[in-house]
């Protein structure tokens, strides 16, 4: 072909052709339309310089001649101009999705043989089978502004590197807020959602002035959009989310419209510029299917239809969907490091309004105890740990349950002034670290015992409880579930006092009244007649005050600042010293669960090695000290998924042995032998706390075995457990001492071993009668209305000093406790015919 013919071919104008293809018959029809007015332009963003050939992509012809129609009926838009730059000829509905017909070397002056168009019109080459399929939303769509659902918002943890997507509803709410403030029109679907569900947020345009009292431009108060299950609120400039119920846990957020191949969002300024240029160049162009329009052989020779230079990056368009990001630099650096990164427009999955957090059916307020001074955010982490454990347990045990509980932290220590640092001033400087630790932990207990600081602590806790509840209700107005309190350590004591409206002044009032009565009864007093009459009048006035004042004198002592504004269903006292506090107050069973108690039920949950925890059931009857607390089954045990309400009473093993020895002593009339053989109760009590669950009573208290052992093998199991216990039990707290089980076994006589086996066999047979025996032990004394004490199971390795120290803080991540909480909150009451335990 001569140069004049080539020049004539290159200068041909594009003609608009419309093509209708019949897929069944394989026929193609073409119709010509009058040529519309063409507008040629040269855009710097569409220019590929030929000076540096290392930067120039040299696409080859892809089978379509210049000036012919694409399968969609649009002309190929790319042609070289006489100046050596690519020129875009726009026509109505021009399709820039795939460039074609470029010279093989990318040089407009080179000679290229271009095949003539067939009479039936050009046919697009078949798409490679390995080409990824684009999302459904990209099929047969034109390039327009992204819908709200195509944009996805992300958050990043403070020390994280990855961006995590919000759920569909949170992302839509953030995008609607963003567009309302920017004055960007919502698409039809999002406008409908806004009108139905989000009008109460009153999202205003950012630049809209407010006219009030003659002041123009006063910034309006932005609505508080809450995300992440209602625990975080969005700041005014949509750059981060701040926690609502605790402090110092802000997370950066980012609006994602353009993404890397792994769908990590680009920075918002860069994304906005790319989006603006993309719409300017490709608006109303058809979006083809797949993630690229080029085959594997063509990827190295992609043309550059448009280019954008932003902050050290080059963004290049090879088609509507083939966009790549390049780092700037010289040719060597680009060759070594700066490989192009494909970009994706719109998130891989559209946001769905129904993709929301589970409905909240129960609110649990988590109150910390001692040791929080200087660690204000620790309780927030602990509350999240408990919630994660409960949710994980519910996914396994209650997969059909759609709702979830919400655990919110209540941090009360940092807001208190107490002695204004006087304790720190009087602390001896020697061993300062240890003394500072004691001041931040043990001093909280002493503060609470002080009549001077106790009121400040109680009011501080009540204030934070009410504040958290009000915030939650404001952010979740549809919530109508129950509220419970999870109190740890000293926090459980404070919450119990708040719920029972206990005041130490009541105890003081009783003491004063008793002193007056004793004084008036004495005859040897030197008080005058007038003084005696004044005391009698005071006593009578106090009695009338109790009788006539609604609520009695108690109402005068307990102020409004010490009362909750909501009803509490459950109190979970975890690792609680409540028992010893009640003992120091002279408490009785009537005081433990009085009529004034503003709670439905109390659960006293403790670890057997926790030095701070105490039992509560012996308050009702001293005989309960012989009854075991309910042992929580392991979370891997099938029995842990059933209710604990129907478990029989379980008597301590050491007490059973003591009764058996006493009975033998009575038969043999040998009191000395009975005394000798009934000794060592402390050692047996330790055995009770960590005995093997494979004994005869495992049907009542076994926490680890999946199924209870048959009664026929219980005796053998008990004997084996006894041998193992004797070998391991020695040195429970003995460090640095040597223990030789083989030596111990060799020194034991065969007769003693046989006697031990016989005793365990007899003991296993007696275990079947534990329930009636427990009833006999309790007799006609006061009974608990429901079981209160619940004991966690220690791990096999938790027999050391360190285990004792850390057991008080091991509740937050305990899986057995998490499953128990889930059962209490969501387990449905059993019918009478189902009341029998499934493992019985």
Curated annotation (Swiss-Prot):
EC numbers for this chain: 3.1.1.111, 3.1.1.4
Protein's GO biological process: phosphatidylcholine catabolic process; phosphatidylinositol catabolic process; phosphatidylinositol metabolic process; regulation of asymmetric cell division; regulation of protein localization
Domain DDHD: 564-827
Segments of skewed composition (Acidic residues): 681-694
Protein activity control: Inhibited by E-6-bromomethylene-3-1-naphthalenyl-2H-tetrahydropyran-2-one (BEL) in vitro.
Annotated Basic and acidic residues bias: 26-39, 668-680
One annotated Gene Ontology cellular component of this protein: cytoplasm
Segments of this protein annotated with the region Disordered: 1-142, 666-718
Biased composition (Low complexity): 97-111
A single MF term (Gene Ontology): phosphatidylinositol-4,5-bisphosphate binding
PANTHER family (UniProt xref): INTRACELLULAR PHOSPHOLIPASE A1, PA-PL1 PHOSPHOLIPASE FAMILY
Functional note: Hydrolyzes the ester bond at the sn-1 position of glycerophospholipids and produces 2-acyl lysophospholipids, being phosphatidylinositol (PI) its major substrate. PI is a versatile lipid that not only serves as a structural component of cellular membranes, but also plays important roles in signal transduction through distinct phosphorylated derivatives of the inositol head group. Catalyzes the hydrolysis of phosphatidylcholine at sn-2 position in vitro. Regulates asymmetric division, an important property of stem cells in C.elegans, by controlling the subcellular localizations of beta-catenin.
Protein's name according to its UniProt entry: Intracellular phospholipase A1
Native source species: Caenorhabditis elegans
């Amino acid at each position: 072909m001569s140069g004049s013919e080539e020049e004539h071919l290159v200068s041909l104008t594009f003609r608009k052709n419309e093509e209708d293809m019949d897929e069944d018959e394989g026929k193609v029809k073409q119709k010509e339309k009058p040529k519309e007015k063409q507008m040629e332009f040269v855009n710097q963003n569409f220019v590929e310089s030929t000076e540096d050939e290392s930067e120039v992509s040299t696409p080859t012809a892809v089978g379509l001649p210049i000036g012919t129609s694409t399968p969609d009926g649009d002309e190929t838009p790319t042609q070289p101009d006489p100046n050596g730059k690519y020129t875009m000829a726009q026509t109505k509905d021009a399709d820039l999705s795939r460039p074609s017909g470029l010279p093989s070397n990318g040089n407009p002056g080179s000679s290229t043989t271009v095949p003539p168009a067939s009479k039936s019109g050009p046919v697009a080459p078949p798409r490679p089978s390995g080409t990824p399929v684009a999302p459904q939303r990209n099929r047969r769509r034109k390039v327009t502004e992204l819908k709200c659902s195509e944009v996805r918002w992300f958050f990043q943890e403070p020390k994280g590197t990855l961006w995590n997507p919000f759920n569909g509803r949170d992302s839509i709410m953030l995008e609607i807020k963003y567009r309302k403030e920017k004055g960007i029109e919502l698409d039809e679907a999002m406008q409908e959602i806004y009108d139905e569900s989000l009008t109460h947020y009153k999202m205003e345009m950012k630049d809209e002035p407010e006219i009030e009292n003659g002041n123009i431009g006063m910034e309006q108060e932005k609505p508080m959009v809450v995300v992440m299950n209602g625990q975080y609120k969005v700041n005014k400039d949509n750059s981060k989310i701040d926690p609502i119920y605790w402090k110092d846990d802000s997370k950066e957020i980012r609006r994602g419209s353009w993404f890397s191949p792994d769908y990590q969002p680009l920075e918002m300024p860069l994304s906005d510029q790319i989006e603006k240029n993309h719409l300017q160049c490709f608006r109303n162009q058809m979006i083809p299917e797949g993630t690229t329009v080029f085959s594997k052989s063509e990827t190295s020779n992609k043309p550059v239809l448009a280019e954008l230079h932003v902050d050290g990056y080059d963004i290049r368009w090879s088609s509507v969907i083939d966009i790549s990001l390049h780092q700037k630099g010289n040719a060597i650096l680009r060759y070594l490091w700066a490989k192009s990164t494909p970009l994706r427009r719109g998130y891989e999955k559209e946001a769905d309004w129904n993709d929301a957090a589970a409905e909240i059916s129960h609110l649990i307020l988590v109150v910390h105890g001692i040791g929080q001074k200087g660690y204000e955010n620790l309780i927030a982490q602990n509350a999240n740990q408990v919630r994660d454990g409960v949710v994980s347990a519910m996914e396994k045990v209650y997969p059909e349950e759609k709702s979830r509980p919400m655990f919110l932290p209540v941090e009360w220590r940092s807001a208190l002034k107490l002695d204004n640092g006087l304790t720190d001033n009087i602390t001896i400087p020697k061993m300062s670290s240890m003394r500072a630790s004691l001041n931040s932990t043990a001093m909280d207990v002493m503060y609470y015992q002080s009549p001077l600081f106790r009121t400040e602590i109680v009011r501080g806790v009540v204030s934070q409880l009410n504040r958290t509840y009000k915030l939650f209700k404001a952010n979740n107005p549809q919530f109508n579930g129950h509220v419970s309190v999870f109190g740890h350590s000293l926090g459980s004591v404070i919450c119990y006092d708040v719920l029972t409206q206990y005041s130490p002044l009541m105890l003081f009032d009783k003491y004063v009244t008793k002193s007056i009565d004793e004084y008036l009864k004495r005859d040897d007093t030197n008080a005058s007649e007038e003084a005696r009459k004044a005391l009698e009048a005071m006593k009578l006035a106090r009695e009338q005050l109790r009788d006539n004042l609604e609520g009695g004198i108690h109402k005068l002592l307990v102020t409004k600042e010490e009362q909750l504004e909501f009803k509490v269903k459950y109190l979970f006292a975890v690792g609680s010293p409540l028992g010893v506090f009640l003992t120091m107050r002279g408490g009785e069973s009537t005081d433990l669960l009085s009529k004034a108690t503003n709670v439905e039920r109390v659960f006293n949950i403790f670890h057997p090695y926790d030095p701070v925890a105490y039992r509560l059931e012996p308050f009702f009857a001293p005989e309960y000290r012989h009854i075991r607390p309910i042992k929580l089954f392991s979370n891997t045990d099938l029995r842990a998924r059933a209710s604990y309400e129907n478990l029989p009473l379980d008597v301590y093993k050491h007490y059973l042995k003591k009764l058996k020895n006493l009975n033998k002593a009575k038969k043999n009339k040998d009191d000395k032998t009975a005394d000798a053989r009934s000794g060592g109760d402390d050692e047996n009590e330790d055995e009770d706390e960590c005995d093997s669950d494979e004994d005869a009573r495992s049907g009542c208290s076994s926490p680890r075995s999946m199924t209870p052992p048959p009664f026929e093998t219980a005796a053998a199991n008990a004997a084996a457990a006894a041998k193992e216990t004797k070998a391991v039990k020695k040195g429970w707290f003995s460090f640095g001492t040597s223990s030789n089980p083989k030596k111990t076994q060799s020194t034991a006589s065969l007769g003693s071993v046989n006697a031990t086996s016989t005793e365990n066999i007899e003991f296993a047979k007696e275990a079947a009668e534990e329930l009636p025996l427990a009833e006999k032990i309790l007799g006609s004394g006061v009974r608990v209305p429901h079981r209160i004490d619940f004991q966690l199971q220690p791990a096999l390795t938790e027999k050391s000093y360190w285990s004792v120290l850390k057991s008080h803080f091991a509740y937050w991540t305990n899986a057995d406790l998490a499953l128990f909480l889930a059962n209490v909150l969501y387990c449905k009451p059993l019918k009478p015919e189902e009341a029998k335990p499934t493992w019985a």
